[in-house]
Amino acid sequence: MASLQDIRRRIDSTKKTSQITSAMQMVSSSKLIQIQKHTSGYLDYANHVEAIVAHLAAAHLLEHQNGSSIPFITQRPVKTTAILVITSDRGLVGGYNNQVLKRTDQIMREQKLTKENAVIFALGGKGSDYYAKRGFTIAFENRDITDVPKFWEVSDLVKEVTKQYAARKFDALELVFNHFINRLKNDVVNQQILPIRSENFQRDEKGNLTADKYKGQSSIYEFEPAPESLLKIVLPQFAQSLLYGAILDAKTAEHAASASAMRAATDNAKDLISTLELKYNRARQAAITTEITEITGGMAALQ
């Protein structure tokens, strides 16, 4: 049985840990508020840009039903697939990283991806280390971004992705990250980013664009430069904006997961302290009772 001194030492140690996790929870909550303000403004902008680009691209594709020369919206045979995995650099975020890595492994099994036909782009050390140890090619990695990442911090990564896709280093890009829902919940999602696809690109059963709202659109606008030249410039930038938006979303989910994990750790520490204090009081009471019994027994022996 642990001594009173050992129990008291554990209580003091757990209280200090509780203070640390409580402080970390407050810090994560503060970071969450900051990034939510930044992300909400960016997503409003990105949604409007997406609608405009999708409209322009669909109108262009309607006039090029037999194929477009723009690689970012043209389907091609997939020989190599790239996966952009967004994780954190450190732990203390609950199941945040495990969810992403588990979904990525699932995608690889479903698409029969191996070290020979898949490459990894990694944002965050956990994902990069995980797949490097398994022998996958890490085409590019980015670590130690700030709590509210600016575009310039991740520009090397997102530009490298679009550069390698345009150079046909890979033929499709899957993105796997945690999508922020609320403070208590996030959901791991995966989506194909390249080639760019949109629900606005309505097609018939043969894969031909059929959306009436796009027919003749290019004829009622005057473009300078020509639509095809414009799309060749705009689409890589649009793909980069999609990636940046996902990074902000994932970072928001990371702060929420960290706050939730630290809150759970603080609650567990408080429960443990209550249990230890009860154990301490019982042990102390038993020690006092034993001491009284010994004194009483000694007095009886003297009589």
Swiss-Prot record:
Tell me where it mainly resides: membrane
UniProt topology in membrane: Peripheral membrane protein
A single Gene Ontology MF term assigned here is:
ATP binding
- Quick one: a GO cellular component term? proton-transporting ATP synthase complex
What does the UniProt keyword field contain? Answer: ATP synthesis, Cell membrane, CF(1), Hydrogen ion transport, Ion transport, Membrane, Transport
Could you tell me where this protein is found in the cell?
Cell membrane
* Source superkingdom: Bacteria
Any one GO biological process: proton motive force-driven plasma membrane ATP synthesis
Does the record bear Zinc-finger in its keywords?
Answer: no
Gene3D superfamilies this protein is in? Answer: 3.40.1380.10, ATP synthase, gamma subunit, helix hairpin domain (1.10.287.80)
Q: What does this protein do?
A: Produces ATP from ADP in the presence of a proton gradient across the membrane. The gamma chain is believed to be important in regulating ATPase activity and the flow of protons through the CF(0) complex.
NCBIfam families to which the protein is assigned, alphabetical: ATPsyn_F1gamma (TIGR01146)
Q: Give the HAMAP family listed for this entry.
A: ATP_synth_gamma_bact
Assembly and binders: F-type ATPases have 2 components, CF(1) - the catalytic core - and CF(0) - the membrane proton channel. CF(1) has five subunits: alpha(3), beta(3), gamma(1), delta(1), epsilon(1). CF(0) has three main subunits: a, b and c.
Family, as annotated? Belongs to the ATPase gamma chain family.
The protein's name is ATP synthase gamma chain
Q: What are the top taxonomic ranks of the organism?
A: Bacteria, Bacillati, Bacillota, Bacilli, Lactobacillales
Name of the coding gene: atpG
